[in-house]
UniProtKB/Swiss-Prot annotation:
Xref: Pfam families: FMO-like
Organism: Arabidopsis thaliana
GO MF annotation list: flavin adenine dinucleotide binding; N,N-dimethylaniline monooxygenase activity; NADP binding
Annotated transmembrane regions: none
Keyword set, alphabetical order: FAD, Flavoprotein, Monooxygenase, NADP, Oxidoreductase
Protein's name according to its UniProt entry: Flavin-containing monooxygenase FMO GS-OX-like 1
Transcription among keywords: no
Biological process according to GO: glucosinolate biosynthetic process; response to jasmonic acid; response to salicylic acid
Length: 468
């Protein structure tokens, strides 16, 4: 049921107005489409809107739980410098008055940046706030169009027909838990990082943190300031100590949990703990999307998709912005949005459905040949020097290199690809995340590169369209 798009404006729905949805709305409007954004909350910002509220189930497995969509903890700071985080024509620079001036600012500064972006490009005029999308499905009258059913916070329901739907609902709301034998009988308290806000509940406790990626590292050190002991369970064990924290230890993965409150690690170490914090990531989740099986989620692979964006059988009527994780997220949202907008207008053509499917299947086969698990399908970065993918060879980078991906999309839609300075700054920054120690955000030696970056920023004109 692949749609045939001729060159004209389309009526497009965008679901979710976080960093992906905001730039999607802008790029769709720039391409001449009429756009309506659906946002369940009162404000733009998505992931970056902090709240003290958490799910009613601390590990978020109860299907009937009260769901809170924010996963931000109070102490969160960015793990990339602001200079490489922003959209191409709207630099994320220090605000002149209020805000956090640090290069690795806190979440409030990122939210203010997104709010400034929405204001600058008058995006809020196209948003229906406090409106939850309940169902997206082919229109019964015309299966080349899409029916969107929604409900506002005051209980009023409605539906509308669109030529296309762009899904930007993020992937940091539905927690994923690792399988740990015996965990169901372990007597201590458990929480997923989705529901972590402050360290106070762990005062004087022995805490095990499962996972050592960005949130795991942040939460471990946050809790270490107040807990008796913190033990990190990590797949990437380099040493058993961590930075300047005497009460923090690193262990390999967990072998099993026991009813007596102990946890056994794979190196034989046994720890009696009061609490476990699961920093084990999230699942892609689209409860509103009804595609009759044309799009599925299996072990965190959303597929089949052409270039992480278009389901071949439904393209271009359905598209996804922001599925790949890691990498330069805001820039990726922007360039994917340019591609989707230009495809919908007919300015850029997609291959035939069978060709897109062939390429998707070939991509999945390549990942399988390399031994890359399905859950890393949307991992978009250069694996060289990245311990998450430390077993892969440099020549495998072509499979998942974000630079190649950005360059390919830029060529399709005739826009500027990733700037050399942004790529260089990211490559330096991502190594610091893994190898820079617990104070990497406040130590850097890239002054010369930053001078180059700000010279490039100075060339931008206000409200400049960098796609032209």
């Amino acid at each position: 049921m692949t749609s045939v798009i001729t060159s004209r404006a389309r009526h497009v729905a965008v679901i979710g107005l976080g960093a992906a949805g905001l730039v999607a709305v802008r790029e769709l409007r720039r391409e001449g489409h009429t756009v309506i954004g659906f946002e369940r909350e009162k404000h733009v910002g998505g992931l970056w809107v902090y709240t003290d509220r958490v799910d009613s189930d601390s590990v978020s497995v109860d299907p009937d739980r009260t769901i809170v969509h924010s996963s931000i903890y109070q102490s969160l700071r960015t793990n990339l410098p602001r200079e490489c985080m922003g959209y191409s024509d709207f630099p994320f620079v220090t605000r002149s008055s209020d805000g956090d001036p640090r290069r690795y600012p806190d979440h409030r500064e990122v939210l203010m940046y997104l709010q400034d972006f929405a204001k600058e490009f008058k995006i809020e005029d196209m948003i229906r706030f406090e409106t939850e999308v309940l169902c997206v499905e082919p229109s019964p009258e015309n299966n080349r169009k899409w029916r969107v059913q929604f409900k506002s916070s005051n209980g009023v329901s409605g539906e509308e027909i669109f030529d296309a739907v762009v899904v930007c609902n993020g992937h940091f709301t539905e927690p994923r838990l690792a399988h740990i034998p015996g965990i169901e009988s372990w007597p201590g308290k458990q929480i997923h990082s989705h529901n972590y806000r402050i360290p106070d509940p762990f005062k004087d406790e022995v805490v095990i943190v499962i996972g050592s990626q960005a949130s795991g590292n942040d939460i471990s050190t946050d809790i270490a300031t107040i807990a008796k002991e913190v033990h990190i369970s990590s797949k990437m064990v380099a040493s058993d100590s961590y930075g300047c924290y005497d009460n923090l230890r690193i262990h390999p993965t967990i072998y099993r949990a026991r009813e007596d409150g102990s946890v056994v690690f794979r190196n034989g170490k046994v720890v009696f703990a009061d609490a476990i914090v699961h920093c084990t990531g999230y699942k892609y989740h689209f409860p509103f999307l009804k595609t009759s099986g044309y799009v599925t989620v299996e072990d965190n692979r959303v597929g089949p998709l052409y270039k992480h964006v278009f389901p071949p059988a439904l393209a271009p009527g359905i598209s996804f912005i922001g599925l790949p994780f890691m990498g330069l997220q805001f820039f990726m949202f922007e360039i994917q949005s340019k591609w989707v907008a230009s495809v919908l207008s007919g300015r850029v053509k997609l291959p035939a459905e069978d060709k897109m499917m062939e390429e998707a299947v070939a991509f999945y086969s390549k990942l399988e040949d390399l031994g890359i698990p399905k859950r890393y399908t949307h991992f978009l970065t250069d694996p060289r020097g990245n311990p998450m993918l430390g077993t892969f060879k440099p020549e495998d980078a072509v499979v998942i290199s974000q630079s190649d991906y950005f360059n390919w999309i830029a060529k399709q839609c005739g826009c500027t690809s990733i700037e050399r300075w942004r790529e260089r700054l990211y490559n330096v920054a991502i190594k610091k995340v893994f190898f820079g120690g617990d104070s990497y955000r406040d130590r850097w030696d890239d002054d010369q590169l930053i001078e180059e970056v700000y010279r490039e920023f100075a060339k931008l004109k206000p409200n400049q369209d960098c796609s032209s």
